[in-house]
Amino acid sequence: MSDYKSTLNLPETGFPMRGDLAKREPGMLQRWYDDKLYSIIREAKKGKKTFILHDGPPYANGSIHIGHSVNKILKDIIVKSKGMAGYDSPYVPGWDCHGLPIEHKVEQTIGKPGEKVSAAEFRAACRQYAAEQVEGQKADFIRLGVLGDWDRPYLTMDFKTEANIIRALGKIIGNGHLHKGAKPVHWCLDCRSALAEAEVEYYDKTSPSIDVMFDAVDKDAVQAKFGAAHVNGPISLVIWTTTPWTMPANRAISLHPEFDYQLVQVEGRALILAKDMVDSVMKRVGVTQWTVLGDVQGAALELMGFQHPFLAHVSPVVLGEHVTLEAGTGAVHTAPGHGPDDYVIGQKYGIETANPVGPDGSFLPGTYPTLDGLNVFKANDTIVELLREKGALLHLEKLHHSYPHCWRHKTPIIFRATPQWFISMDQKGLRAQSLKEIKGVQWIPDWGQARIESMVANRPDWCISRQRTWGVPMALFVHKDTEQLHPDSLELMEKVALRVEQDGIQAWWDLDARELMGADADNYVKVPDTLDVWFDSGSTSYSVVDARPEFGGSAPDLYLEGSDQHRGWFMSSLMISTAMKGKAPYRQVLTHGFTVDGQGRKMSKSLGNTVSPQDVMNKLGADILRLWVASTDYSGEIAVSDEILKRSADSYRRIRNTARFLLANLAGFNPETDKVKPEEMVVVDRWAVGRALAAQNDIVASYEAYDFHEVVQRLMQFCSVEMGSFYLDIIKDRQYTAKADGLARRSCQTALWYIVEALVRWMAPIMSFTADEIWGYLPGKRAQYVFTEEWFDGLFSLEDNQPMNDAYWAELLKVRGEVNKVIEQARADKRVGGSLEASVTLYADAQLAEKLTSLGEELRFVLLTSGAEVADYAGAPDDAQQSETVKGLKIALRKAEGEKCPRCWHYTSDIGQNAEHADMCGRCVTNVAGSGEERKFA
């Protein structure tokens, strides 16, 4: 017997079976950057319609975590898929570089500004630290395979960006949105600074819960309001609070104008309580017997005076809609210096905004003898005892509740009224315009719209000033006496911005006001405050996108961040853009969930369930990480664990194996000379190209909708089901045994070439390294990189009006599935070994029989059997297997007759009829020594 291996067209490719991504990817990255790949893409896409995904800047502090990886990979998938869709989609990554976390890190090494180092030295150290952090994070982001302008990212500490941030504030002032006020703001005692809404986190805390009695100044007048004939003892209005330390700042008591309040006689005094709260209060304070002396609505008690328990002033009753009956007494202790609602009602009634608390959280001198200099939280017990001594404490208990904490220090914060600068939500209609703009944006998922609408509708004015060292200065001058802004503020801010553009923010602190305004400087002082870092990042649609030429003056199309950014970057960006330009900075806003472990738990070092992206890349490669991100429905929580990543690695192997099979079977194929015209191709090859077209339509639509898990599912279905379990299986015989350059094989190779040309493009946005690797093994002339290409436009499909259309092949696949079941059973029964040892008879009804017989002799190639016949359904023997899924089909199997051909392994009766190839079947003789077999259908 001869060795016929040399006569077969065995698959051959240098494309490795194993990805070895962790080893290979760094070399590919090096080539990308040596070749300046990002510049190559920009050049290739020049002049096309732009799509701008504006990067929300991560904070330049610490190593990247798995959440950063999810975010950057999602962005990269979008940018690359937009490039494939024919857009010029530049991607400029950015970093948020000012602010408190960096100050803290620098303080740990060189001390606080003004102590061991000057403020200027401190800022220089902060700038240096931030630059180092950017470089570390940048290396990790690049390793993820994210393509962008890494040589020229935007940093909020770039001199030009710092200058543009000042200009952004100038435009907002010019539009009338800025005002100054001593409003209560979130204040961190450790930071000694105001905090933004997005810098506040809520944790459980135990606080003293107290009911306090304020005695009526004019008992008779109050008694008359209730129409009470006789009251035994003083009349007290009872408030409830969990912040005893705010009692020194109490200036009023709020009642709801429409709630009913009762005067209730208890032993030795009468209490005023909301009618609906009497029972719960009495139960709480342990009173079992009381008498109701009268009822009035809250409005009737307006401006009645009640004596502060330990200070000399009288607290009037004020009316507010913010009073609820959810807890307490229905009477709200009101300290305008320590609460937003209290402040609003204080403004309405012209009540003093008292703030007896210093920046470090201790009471200022002159507050009260036993309180001066005491930390507010430590003062709680002192105040409780003081109230007890004065006979004003009705009840004390401990309350476990959710309380605001500083995001950085994880310590409780307070509301504290300080002179601050605010962007007003209402004085120039910013709130109304923002709500209008929200409706014109596409929010993905769509619940994001209601979420940000609610936040904008209910948010207070934005406190944009901070008492920090490392930040962009507000660059304002105020009059020494009136504290009014300089009338030429906008002109002065531009002059400051020009200096900052040259020398950075230090230029502001080095500036002598006389240089800008001459003798007028004697009447003005420089505002020492810096801007909230959310102003820095929120203004980047102006300071970066408008300023950089590669964006061509276009507004951003998409912002993509975690779902916490509705109150963070999405909010600050919306406020600033609307305040500056009257319009939203984005057309689409897409949010992703947070990473959790395989059990749905939040990741934390204490639980030991964190997954490091660096470890994953070093072990499995970035493409596995990228495939995991794409495979996940990121609209909710994103689960990651070793097991989940292993599943992604398994999916990757299936896709890689498909690509390798395609490449290996394109050996010796040159599309310029060997490609077969569509109309001359074998029908099943045309069908396979059509399946690729259908898959591409679905995949492109899913990329367009940002449904990347749908992309992966469709890709897997195409590779594993449509190709792997059918087409790639049935073509092996023709591919390996047909004449090398005959039409039967070239038709097949043409289909494989079309398919892999499409497949490599589908993969490129997600499995970028592997797509680049495949690209290098594809036959034919092509661009240097797949990333400059567009979706493959060479695909075509079978026409529906043809007998052998998609519906025909779909039914044939079902028939093949039923035949496979019968073969598997025969193998289990040891009647046959492989499927080529079998010959089948398909007993079919007339309609199905017509379809099956149209394949003629080629039916057996579809079924992968040595013989296949079609017979009348009615004549089926008793042992024929009835199909459960294909109507009008029974299947009988017998062992194939004849001898096994050593070349093609088919069983046939025509072996030995050619003297030169005595042990070969007739078909193989034709393929080896003749003109090659003819195939029309399969």
Swiss-Prot record:
GO BP term (any one): isoleucyl-tRNA aminoacylation
NADP keyword on record: no
Residues the record lists as binding L-isoleucyl-5'-AMP: E561
EC class: ligase
InterPro entries tied to this protein: aa-tRNA-synth_I_CS, aa-tRNA-synth_Ia, Anticodon_Ile_BEm, Ile-tRNA-ligase, Ile-tRNA-ligase_type1, Ile-tRNA_ligase, M/V/L/I-tRNA-synth_anticd-bd, Rossmann-like_a/b/a_fold
Binding-site positions, Zn(2+): C901, C904, C921, C924
Written domain comment of the UniProt record: IleRS has two distinct active sites: one for aminoacylation and one for editing. The misactivated valine is translocated from the active site to the editing site, which sterically excludes the correctly activated isoleucine. The single editing site contains two valyl binding pockets, one specific for each substrate (Val-AMP or Val-tRNA(Ile)).
Task of the protein: Catalyzes the attachment of isoleucine to tRNA(Ile). As IleRS can inadvertently accommodate and process structurally similar amino acids such as valine, to avoid such errors it has two additional distinct tRNA(Ile)-dependent editing activities. One activity is designated as 'pretransfer' editing and involves the hydrolysis of activated Val-AMP. The other activity is designated 'posttransfer' editing and involves deacylation of mischarged Val-tRNA(Ile).
Name under which the protein is recorded: Isoleucine--tRNA ligase
Native source organism of the sequence: Erwinia tasmaniensis (strain DSM 17950 / CFBP 7177 / CIP 109463 / NCPPB 4357 / Et1/99)
